[in-house]
Design a protein with these regions (language model features):
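Loop/turn elements at helix/coil->beta-strand transitions in domains of secreted/extracellular proteins
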Residues: 55-58, 92-95, 148-151, 228-231, ...
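A short beta-strand-to-alpha-helix junction
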Residues: 54-55, 77-81, 98-103, 128-138, ...
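Short, solvent-exposed turn/loop segments enriched in Gly/Ser/Thr/Pro and often Arg
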Residues: 74-79, 91-113, 154-165, 236-241
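Active-site-proximal cap/lid insertion segments
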Residues: 51-57, 66-78, 223-229, 237-283
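N-terminal export signals
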Residues: 3-8, 14-37, 41
Length: 283
């Protein structure tokens, strides 16, 4: 067992075991852009009531980067996200999460350890010299679910280990860091350096991340199913993070692009980005 507050860790493990038996993987029929349905609202407090369900649910956890929650009426008229809606109807939606930090590394450290940043020590992004890698002594969701009997796997963006983003060049990767991710409680990681996503990072890499997730489900996931072993797969996408690096300057007006630390680009020349949705941005 990794170091930490034993009482707190045991409480987290007990909660995760209960959730694994029902709450996380159950289909609760929630509306992604509103409150859960009546059946979901009554089912949510009843995780203990579902704990007696035989077997454990497989858990597919999909994490996007920098995607805000839209309340009813905030999206433009006619705008729909059918894939989001399908996931909401078939899976579990968390509508009461409060963001702990608007910076990537601190926020991800809390999501994957259930501890605040004063405990994870991840106060800023790992690509800054004053931040070290997250300690492998800190139990993660992967560690806790492994204790509960799950096979745990991870795909995509991590941004919690310094070495992941400094050793490899994206064009000529030499190390995939599978062994290093085992120390954080996750198997089957395959990275070409950490995909921390600067300009067009999501556009370039999310297809690869999604494909790795699908490949895992068709391969390892099916094998585990025949063995009767429950699994947890975390698929970590980059977008809509690309918006941080969009160049909105008009031709001949280098206003935004002056005196900045990173690279920015206009939107890709892709039909996906061609459609316009004219509506007022939040103040």
């Amino acid at each position: 067992m990794k170091n930490g507050n034993a009482g707190v860790d045991e409480g987290r493990r007990a909660a995760l075991k209960t959730m694994g038996a029902g709450a996380i993987g159950a289909s609760i029929g929630a509306d992604l852009f509103g409150t859960p349905s009546a059946s979901a609202a009554t089912a949510a407090p009843g995780a203990s009531a579902r704990a007696a369900t035989p077997g454990a649910y497989n858990i597919l956890f999909i994490l996007t980067d920098q995607e805000r929650y839209f309340r009813p009426g905030e999206l433009p008229a006619g705008y729909r996200l059918p894939a989001h809606e399908s996931l909401a109807q078939r899976g579990t939606v968390f509508v009461n999460h409060q963001i702990n930090s608007c910076v990537c590394t601190p926020s991800r450290s809390v999501l994957y350890t259930d501890r605040h940043i004063q405990h994870t020590k991840m106060f800023d992004n790992t690509n800054f010299p004053w931040i070290s890698s997250m300690s492998t002594e800190l139990p993660t969701v992967g560690d806790m679910l492994r204790d509960a009997g799950y096979y745990t796997a991870y795909k995509g963006k991590w941004h919690l280990t310094k070495e992941f983003e400094t050793v490899n060049d994206l064009g000529t990767p030499t190390k995939i860091f599978t062994k290093e991710m085992e120390a954080y409680g996750f198997s089957d990681y395959f990275g070409v350096g950490d995909i921390i996503a600067h300009d067009q990072g999501g556009y370039l890499h999310d297809g690869i991340i999604s494909a790795m997730g699908v490949n895992w489900l068709r391969g390892r996931g099916m094998t585990l199913a025949t063995q009767g072993k429950p699994w947890f797969l975390a698929v970590n996408l980059v977008n809509p993070h690309d918006i941080m690096f969009i160049d909105t300057d008009r031709p001949g007006e280098p206003v935004q692009s002056r005196n900045i630390l990173g690279h920015i680009r206009p939107e890709p020349a892709d039909p996906l980005y061609a459609r316009q949705w004219p509506f007022d941005l939040p103040a």
